[in-house]
UniProtKB/Swiss-Prot annotation:
This is Elongation factor G. CDD domains: EF-G (cd01886), EFG_III (cd16262), EFG_mtEFG1_IV (cd01434), EFG_mtEFG_C (cd03713), EFG_mtEFG_II (cd04088). InterPro entries: EFG_II, EFG_III, EFG_III/V, EFG_IV, EFG_V, EFG_V-like, EFTu-like_2, G_TR_CS. The lineage of its organism: Bacteria, Pseudomonadati, Pseudomonadota, Gammaproteobacteria, Thiotrichales. The gene is fusA. The keyword Protein biosynthesis applies.
Amino acid sequence: MPRNTALEKYRNIGICAHVDAGKTTTTERILFYTGLSHKIGEVHDGAATMDWMEQEQERGITITSAATTTFWSGMDQQFEKHRINIIDTPGHVDFTIEVERSLRVLDGAVVVFCGSSGVEPQSETVWRQANKYGVPRIVFVNKMDRSGADFERVCAQIKTRLKANVVPVQLNIGAEEDFKGVIDLIRMKAIMWNEEDMGLTYELVDIPADLQDRAEELRMEMIEAAAEASEELMEKYLEGGELSEDEIHQGLRARVLNNEIVLAFCGSAFKNKGVQAVLDGVVRYLPAPNQVPAIKCETEDGEPASRPSSDDAPFAALAFKLATDLFVGNLTFIRVYSGVLKSGDAVYNPVKGKKERVGRIVQMHANKRDEIKEVRAGDIAACIGLKDVTTGDTLCDQEDVVILEKMDFPEPVISVAVEPKSKADQEKMSIALGKLAAEDPSFRVKTDEESGQTIISGMGELHLDIIVDRMRREFKVEANVGNPQVAYRETIRSKVEQEAKFVRQSGGRGQYGHVFVRFEPLDEVDENGEAKVFKFVDEVVGGVVPKEYIGSVAKGIEEQLNNGVLAGYPMIGVKATLYDGSYHDVDSSEMAFKIAGSMALKEGAKKANACILEPIMKVEVVTPEDYLGDVMGDLNRRRGIIEGMDENPSGRVINALVPLAEMFGYATNVRSISQGRASFSMEFKKYAEVPNNIADEIIKSRNS
C-alpha cells in the first residue's frame, strides 16, 4: 500500500507552554481551522477536545499529552495538503515528564507565550528541554487582547531570559481591547481576519500609516536574518538590500532547522486571530521527519548506529507514552522512526528482550480513535495489544535490532502514604497504582518495609492529588491519604579511609573479603547538569584484590547507599576509591567482597561527618505590589532565600529558593495572604544541607 502523504509533507509538532498561556485553546483553534472539529471547545467551558480526562476538564489544565492528526493546505490553499501530527503538552511543572516525553519524539515545536505575562518559569523549563533534544521551534505570542499585552516586550524577554535569537515575522496592529490583526512582514500587508466566520477568511489591507516605519525596521532585521543562511543570499542582499518572498522563506527555514533563530508570530487564539498564520508557519518553517538528523541508536552490542527516516529501512519505533483506555485496555503511543508496521505484525522489544504481536493500530484524535491498517516512518499512532512495553522502550524488527536512546526521568521529590479504605479496595488499589506507574515514570510506588504502608511519590502536590483522583474515578478505589513526606537524602562532608573485613571460617568452605576504601564527597555533575549520586574508582595495584571481585565491592557499596547512617535515607554525592585489600584462594567469593564493601561504607560514613540534605525548590511568586511585603515575610518564615525581583504586568515577581518541607499547603496560604491575587510555581532545584536543629528532629522522628 503506497503512502497517502509524502514524508516531506509530514510535520510532527508539539504545542508547549506555561500553564495558562493559552496552549489548549490554540490547539482547539488549529483543529477548527483544519476542519477536524466543527464546534470549537473552550477550556473555560470544560469542553476542549484535547483535554479529555475528567480531571482536566474540571481543573482547566492539560495533564496528559493528547496526540492528534490533522491536515492543512495553507490560509490561501497555497500548499499541497500537509499532514500535521500535533501533541498538546501540559504546562504545569508537576507534569514536566509529559513534556519531556513529547519533545523526545517530535521534530518541531510551537511554543506559546502569554502576551502579558511573557516568559514564566515553566517556559524556561520547556525551553531547556527543547534545547536538550535540539527541537527547532517557532513562537506564538498569544492573548494579545489581554490587558498589558506587548508583543515586542515578550520577544525581548525571550531574548534575555531564554537566550534565544528571536526574529519577528509579524507585528501586531493594536493591543489589549484594540487588538485588530497582524502585519505580515514578508508580504508587507496587514491581515484582518473576519470575525463573522470565526477567522476562517481574512482580507489583506494596507499597513496602518502609524506602524509603517516600525514594520520596515523589523522587516530589515528579518531579511538580514534570512540572508545569513547562505553566502548566495548574503551576496544578493548586500548588492540590492532586498530578497524575494521565496528567498526569505528559504533563508528563514534553513536557519530555524539549524536552531539558529526562532521566528515569532502573534495573535489571540480566543479571538480567532493569528493561529491560521501559525499553521502556515508550521508548514513553511518546521522540519519534516526526513529533514532532521537521522535518529541515533545503539546496536545490541552497544555500538553506536543511526536510522534514516525512510519506509525502506528496517522497522524501529519508540514507545513514548502508555495510557489505559476503559474500552480497549492498554494503548501504547509510538513514534515510528523507520520502516513500516502493519496490524498483526510481531515486533521485538530489545529493552525487555521480548517479542510481542501488535493487535490493532489506531490514529488518535484527542480521545476518539480511527483504526488504521499500517503505520510508516514519521507516523505517530497508538497500538493495542502490547502487554510488556513501558515508556521509553524501543520496538523494532527482530532481524535488525536497535535500541533507541533511553529517556532520563526525574526523581520524585514528594511522597505520601495511601491506605485503602476497605479490604475490598486493597487489591484494586495495587492494580490501579501499578497501571498508573506504568503510564507515568515520574510517579513511583513502594511499600515501606517498617510500617507496611504503601508510599506513592511524585513531582509535586498537584501531581499526587491527580493520581489519587484518577484512582477514585477510573479504578473506583477509595483511599485515605497521609501527610506529605519529603524525600530527604544523606551525604558525607569529609574524607575518610576505612578498612572492612568479612570473614567466616569454621571448617569447609568459608567466606573471606578484605578491603580498604577511601570515601570522600563527590562534587561532579552529569551531562544534564544534575549532581552525580555515586562514583567508584579502582586504584588496586598488584592484584591484592583480584579483578573479578572489584565489581562486587562497588556493588556492595552502591546497595548500602540506599540505607544512610543517620536516619536511613538514601545517600548521594559519595566517591569511593578501593585502594587496598587482601583475598583468600579458597574462601574468597563475590558475595564476601560485596558484604565487605557494604560494611566499609556503613562504618566509614559514620566517621565522614554525615549530614542530612533536603530538596530545595526554585519558587517564583507573582503578586500585586500591595501584598509584596506580606508575601516576602511569609517566604522568609519558610526559610526562603530571596534571589531577586522582577516586574511584569501582573505585579512583582519574586524569585526565591525555599525548602520543599516548608512549601506544603503554600498554595492555600499565598491565596489568603493576597486575597486570591498572587500565583506561584515551583520546581526542584537542588539538594542542600538541613540546619542542625531541624536535622535533629528528622533523625529523632525517623528513629523513634
